[in-house]
Every structure is written in C-alpha cells, then in structure tokens.
Amino acid sequence: MTYVLPSLPYSYNSLEPFFDEKTMIIHHTRHHQAYINNTNSILNGTHYENLLIEELISKLNILSIENKLALQNNAGGHINHSLFWKWLKLNTILKDDFKIILEKNFKSVDFFKKQFEKIALSHFGSGWIWLIKKYDNTLRIVTTVNQNTPLMGKEISGISGIPILGLDLWEHAYYLKYKNNRSDYVNAFWNVVNWDEVSYRFFNISNM
C-alpha cells in the first residue's frame, strides 16, 4: 500500500484569520507530504508495506524493521496530521451531549480550555497536545514528543488512549503567523475546533 496525502475538506484559506492560508498550504503539501513520502520509502519492499496506517501505528512496538525510529517519526507524522485536519473547521458549536462529558471530567468547559492551554504552553519543544479518551471513557489531556501519538501505546509514547482532539505544537504549524508566540496560536485554536468531529470521536470511536 502506498500512503497518499488526504485531501482537506475545506480550502486553505477557510480558517482565516486564525490559521493563515500560507501556513496551511505549507503544512499540508510540504510537511505532511514529506512524512508520507518518507514512510513509503522506509516500508517499500518490507512485509509491512500493505498495512493500513492505523494498523502500522498500533503495531510499531512489535515490528522488526530497520530505521524503526525514522518509521515511528514519519508514520506518526502521517496519522497525526490526517487526524488534525479533521479537527479544524470554523463556526461549529459545542453541543450539550459532549459539553456534559467535558464538565464531568473537567468541572467546566472553561477550566478544560485553561488546562489545555497551560499544558500546551508548558510542553518543551516539538510535539502534540491531545485530549484522549481512556478505555474507561474518562478524558485526559496529555502531550507527546515529536510525532508520537497515544495510538502507539504506552511502550512508545508513554501514554495510550484514543485521541479525540489534538493540536500540533511544532513551530511549523504556527511560526509564519504567530512567530514564537505559541500562546496566541493555542488561543486561536478554539476558533477553529471542529466540535462535531470531537464529539463524533468520543461517542463512536472505541479503537483504531
């Protein structure tokens, strides 16, 4: 199987003024594409080249393959970005069914957002911040380094769970618009969160 760049469900300028068009173009067509190209190159001619990306990610800790760390970084970059694009959309509304879930886990939506922002800003260097669903249906905010994902499992990423929301903390995701001001980028994120997708993943995704 050759992995391909997924099309975005919106135009590159659809998230303006919060996520700018130039960043979206570069992020999607260059950064994400590079992760895909590298993953395909590493897997070419191996026993694993026909795995779906979700299968590959879930089995990383047991794969026997050269350049395993490079595969982890690049395959992680592919699946992380494939999810990320789905979490972005202007003008969606946090509906009551999932709002109740957030309030149950974090006392209030505002407190959840403040905790998410605090953890995102305290994360050193490149990585991702996630809202994950644990296997008891509780929610946790966690971060992973580089292109690690909770889908890789605790052995690799230090945490396991189902991502229902995530934000790219690599500088390439925001530097053109926000420079070194990660705080403004994280705050802007709330304006483009696709709450419909977040809610769908919580109520409908039990595993990858």
From Swiss-Prot:
UniProt remark on cofactor binding: Binds 1 Mn(2+) ion per subunit.
Reactions catalysed, as given in the entry: 2 superoxide + 2 H(+) = H2O2 + O2
Sorted UniProt keywords: Manganese, Metal-binding, Oxidoreductase
Recorded GO MF terms: metal ion binding; superoxide dismutase activity
Amino-acid positions noted as binding Mn(2+) in the UniProt annotation, renumbered to this chain: H27, H81, D168, H172
Source superkingdom: Bacteria
InterPro entries (UniProt xref): Mn/Fe_SOD, Mn/Fe_SOD_BS, Mn/Fe_SOD_C, Mn/Fe_SOD_N, Mn/Fe_SOD_N_sf, SOD_C_sf
Cofactor(s), names only, from the UniProt record: Mn(2+)
Enzyme class label: oxidoreductase
E.C. numbers: 1.15.1.1
GO cellular component terms, semicolon-separated: cytoplasm
Name of a matching Pfam family: Sod_Fe_N
Subunit structure: Homodimer.
Function: Destroys superoxide anion radicals which are normally produced within the cells and which are toxic to biological systems.
Family of the protein in this entry: Belongs to the iron/manganese superoxide dismutase family.
Protein name: Superoxide dismutase [Mn]
Gene symbol of the encoding locus: sodA
